[in-house]
From Swiss-Prot:
Entry GO MF terms: protein serine/threonine kinase inhibitor activity; RNA binding
Assembly mode: Homodimer. Interacts with host TRIM25 (via coiled coil); this interaction specifically inhibits TRIM25 multimerization and TRIM25-mediated RIGI CARD ubiquitination. Interacts with human EIF2AK2/PKR, CPSF4, IVNS1ABP and PABPN1.
Chain segments carrying region RNA-binding and homodimerization: 1-73
SUPFAM superfamilies for this protein: Ns1 effector domain-like, S15/NS1 RNA-binding domain
Domain notes: The dsRNA-binding region is required for suppression of RNA silencing.
Location of the protein in the cell: Host nucleus; Host cytoplasm
Motif Nuclear export signal in this chain: 137-146
Position of sequence motif Nuclear localization signal: 34-38
Lineage: Viruses, Riboviria, Orthornavirae, Negarnaviricota, Polyploviricotina
InterPro entries: NS1 (IPR004208), NS1A (IPR000256), NS1A_effect_dom-like_sf (IPR038064), uS15_NS1_RNA-bd_sf (IPR009068)
GO cellular component annotations of the record: host cell cytoplasm; host cell nucleus
Protein name: Non-structural protein 1
Amino acid sequence: MDSNTITSFQVDCYLWHIRKLLSMRDMCDAPFDDRLRRDQKALKGRGSTLGLDLRVATMEGKKIVEDILESETDENLKIAIASSPAPRYIMDMSIEEISREWYMLMPRQKVTGGLMVKMDQAIMGKRIILKANFSVLFDQLETLVSLRAFTEDGAIVAVISPIPSMPGHSTEDVKNAIGILIGGLEWNDNSIRASENIQRFAWGIRDEDGGPPLPPKQKRYMARRIESEV
């Protein structure tokens, strides 16, 4: 096993512990808590894959961080902070919407690029809007927290979410997952539109009528793919 992989995991465990302490002291906001829960699942998955104990890894990570801080100067910290852009958190969904339970009559699912796409293939002839919570860096979607598809009456019919045990995803992974979701739902004559935030930060476009940011050929391709691969 690569030593850098172990070191990275140990440091991630300790930094998660620090963030957890902040949450326990009510010193953080809702997006912070969202990322904390998501990262906890990811660390458990990585720990299982690597065969490492989380408690031991956290203690080793503490030693590594303390060694770095002892040799770090205030000037170096100022330079690092100034040169590193901070991601923004975009929320289409409320806490209630992102945590609401949902059920599928005809479940279909597919894994793509570290993301799980789940949808109810029993949904037909509905108007559906896609909403997502995600972070943005350099004016582009960086990390997806959750994407959900809602009918006009608020029912959830599809979800895209990161797989905790997998090592992350790219903007292209998110776009591909959305394409699969749109293709699968449109197969049953549903009308799909994406939120302005999804269109702007995933595809870099603004569509005033809220239509799905995919050309017809790509949507047909995704529809065929969902039928053949799911």
